């Protein structure tokens, strides 16, 4: 009995109540939902009861196909029935008739979930914000879109705002769009290289998650690009920015989780100016308890921040870091020295033959956290027989007085060749902590 009720010719899905069937159809594109109408007489008009349209311009052949389809749907169900609308298109800024025509039909609809996805990343759609629709929006997702200029705006119900390569009319418009959303909780911005915003202000009393991505190298802005974050309830902050001249964090939750992949760009700046910018940024996140930091950011900070006394993250309890395995013996003790109360460390070691090995740090630095707080270390990348990696493991085992667990992974590609020797060397390493459990995966 697969898909059919025993003793009858009716399949299991068809006997489900219509509200549940409509909910299932809501996860399909409208084109696929319409195709189910040929299954039986019961399915013929079922797709019309799905309060969501997911359209793709490539599915139509006429000049204004999407708008005509929307008209027919609204005439059948009524303007107040539609709750979700998504349009996939491939048009550029010079051919926006499809988008404009669809938006005109949605003017009086109480849309809660609205999404525009431009299939061609190099093309940009010009999009106006429709004021009546804004009052009911809960989720707004735009991809490769130029926002038209707007004045006062209100998004009283908006909780989710995801912008992929969206171009704002001005600095002020970006600030207003965020500030006029009093219940916003999830904000993701991936800025376009054509965006002229120079000061991005993220001010929200309700925001809990903020992701910023800015990795293009050619930007039209001529001034210093900075980010100002004033989000007292923020619980997750993900920064991936390779062109920033500065961050200013006014407020965020003390329990915030921070993911840092940042490289500061100071055009014509001195080494001291770079250090000052880095110190300002580190001061902004000095009270976080959980941090993930990329290899790029770690190398950049380590290279430019040769200050004494070194900056301290007194509240940091969990750290996940990526670094070159060749330079890890020199870098790791220095990084750990900045985290005197660290309890959990996760490492990803990346091998690069162009990076020279460093060992002096291991011989001279004994960070405080190794003596007083570090309880677990998880090395996510497979351990090989390279001297630096084995020395790193020995260093942690021999100097961590409070270590309770060390998790290692063997290199699967060379397990047969190196496993016996690796295990023997690791197991024979002296352990400072008698409670340390060695886990080999």
UniProtKB/Swiss-Prot annotation:
Span of domain FBD: 366-410
Domain F-box span(s) in chain numbering: 10-56
InterPro entries (alphabetical): F-box-like_dom_sf, F-box_AtFBL13-like, F-box_dom, FBD, FBL13/AtMIF1-like, LRR_dom_sf
SUPFAM superfamilies per the UniProt record, alphabetical: F-box domain, RNI-like
Name of one Pfam family that matches: FBD
Domain of life: Eukaryota
Name of the protein: FBD-associated F-box protein At5g18780
Annotated source species: Arabidopsis thaliana (Mouse-ear cress)
């Amino acid at each position: 009995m697969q898909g059919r009720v025993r003793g009858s010719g009716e399949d299991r899905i068809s006997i489900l109540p219509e509200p549940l069937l409509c909910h299932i159809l809501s996860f399909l594109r409208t084109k696929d939902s319409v195709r189910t109408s040929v299954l039986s007489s019961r399915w013929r008009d079922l797709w019309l009861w799905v309060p969501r349209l997911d359209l793709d311009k490539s599915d139509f052949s006429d000049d204004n196909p999407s708008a005509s389809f929307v008209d027919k749907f609204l005439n059948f169900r009524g303007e107040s029935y539609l709750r979700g609308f998504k349009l996939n298109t491939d048009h550029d800024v010079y051919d926006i008739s499809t988008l404009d025509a669809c938006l005109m039909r949605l003017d009086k609809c109480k849309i809660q979930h609205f999404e525009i996805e431009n299939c061609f990343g190099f093309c940009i759609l010009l999009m106006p914000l429709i004021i009546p629709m804004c009052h009911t929006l809960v989720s707004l997702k735009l991809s490769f879109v130029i926002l038209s200029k707007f004045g006062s705006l209100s998004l009283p119900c908006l909780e989710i705002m995801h912008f992929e390569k969206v171009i704002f009319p001005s600095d002020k418009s970006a600030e207003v769009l965020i500030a006029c959303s009093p219940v916003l909780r999830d904000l993701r911005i991936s800025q376009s290289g054509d965006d002229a915003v120079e000061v991005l202000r993220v001010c929200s009393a309700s925001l809990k998650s903020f992701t910023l991505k800015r990795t293009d190298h050619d930007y039209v802005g001529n001034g210093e690009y900075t980010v100002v974050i004033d989000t007292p309830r923020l619980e997750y902050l993900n920064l991936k920015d390779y062109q920033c001249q500065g961050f200013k964090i006014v407020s965020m939750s003390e329990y915030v989780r921070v993911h840092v992949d940042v490289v500061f760009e100071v055009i014509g700046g001195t080494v001291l100016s770079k250090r000052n910018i880095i110190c300002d940024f580190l001061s902004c996140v000095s009270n976080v308890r959980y941090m993930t930091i990329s290899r790029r950011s770690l190398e950049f900070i380590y290279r430019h921040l040769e200050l004494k006394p070194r900056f301290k993250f007194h509240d940091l309890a969990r750290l996940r870091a990526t670094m070159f395995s060749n330079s890890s013996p020199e870098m790791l003790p220095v990084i750990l020295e900045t985290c005197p109360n660290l309890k959990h460390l996760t490492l990803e070691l990346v091998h690069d033959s162009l990076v020279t090995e460093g060992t002096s740090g291991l011989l001279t630095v004994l960070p405080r956290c190794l003596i007083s707080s570090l309880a677990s270390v998880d090395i996510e990348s497979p351990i090989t027989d390279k001297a630096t990696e084995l020395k790193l493991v020995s260093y942690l085992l021999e100097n961590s007085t409070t270590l309770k667990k060390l998790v290692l992974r063997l290199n699967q590609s060379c397990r047969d060749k190196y496993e016996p020797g690796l295990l023997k060397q690791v197991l024979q390493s002296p352990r400072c902590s008698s409670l340390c459990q060695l886990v080999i995966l």
